[in-house]
Amino acid sequence: MKKHLLPLALLFSGISPAQALDVGDISSFMNSDSSTLSKTIQNSTDSGRLINIRLERLSSPLDDGQVIAMDKPDELLLTPASLLLPAQASEVIRFFYKGPADEKERYYRIVWFDQALSDAQRDNANRSAVATASARIGTILVVAPRQANYHFQYANGSLTNTGNATLRILAYGPCLKAANGKECKENYYLMPGKSRRFTRVDTADNKGRVALWQGDKFIPVK
C-alpha cells in the first residue's frame, strides 16, 4: 500500500530506525471542516534530541511527486518548528492551514530533522550540547479541499474516486485465495481520479464487505 499511496521517505545517517524519533503515522489528514491538526512526537531514547521541522508542498504524495511552490508564504504554518526534546519525552506539534478555500486537495511533506545530543566540553564553567547522530524523516500531510465533493463508483470489486478528496477504502470478508486463509482485510488511500481493485478479499461473496470513509464519515458500499 505504501508503494502506491502516500509513501514515507526515511533517510538515516549514523543511527538505526529503532533509535529514530517517533513521529507517529506516516500519513496525516486535515479534513475539509478543520484548519488545524496536532501531531504528537515522542523521544523514546535515553538522550535528548534536537528537532527541526520543515514543510514542503508536493504536486503529489506518490513516488513521482515534485516539490512545488506554495500559493502564499503562510499557506501552512506550524509550531514549534524547532525544539529540544528531552529523553523519554513527548511534544505536540500543531499545524495551521491558511491557504485558499477552494476545491483543490493539497499535499505537503513534513521533513523532520532529528539529532541526538551528548554533553561535551564539560568543566566547572560551561557545558555545551553537540549533535552526535542524525536522521531525516519525511511524512505526508494531506489537506482536504475546503470545498470537498465526495463521489465514488463501485463495480466488480473495483472502487473509483470520482470526487476531489482522498478516500480511505476498506474491504473485508472471505479471502479470494485459499492460500491467504479464511478471512482477509484490505485498506488503502484512494486519491481523486484513481481506481483500486481489491485483490485479497472475495468481494463477490455475499459475506464480502466494502466500505469507505469520507473524512470522518463511514460509508458502507457493499
Curated annotation (Swiss-Prot):
Does the entry feature the keyword Signal, yes or no?
A: yes
Q: Which residues form the signal peptide?
A: 1-20
- Gene3D superfamilies according to UniProt: Immunoglobulins
**Which keywords has UniProt assigned to this entry?**
Chaperone, Fimbrium biogenesis, Signal
* InterPro entries (UniProt xref): EcpB_C (IPR040695), Ig-like_fold (IPR013783), PapD-like_sf (IPR008962)
- Induction line: Negatively regulated by H-NS. Positively regulated by IHF and EcpR.
By sequence similarity, the record places it as follows: Belongs to the EcpB/EcpE family.
Function (record text): Part of the ecpRABCDE operon, which encodes the E.coli common pilus (ECP). ECP is found in both commensal and pathogenic strains and plays a dual role in early-stage biofilm development and host cell recognition.
Name the record gives this protein: Probable fimbrial chaperone EcpB
Question: Which organism does this sequence originate in?
Answer: Escherichia coli O1:K1 / APEC
By which gene is this protein encoded? Answer: ecpB
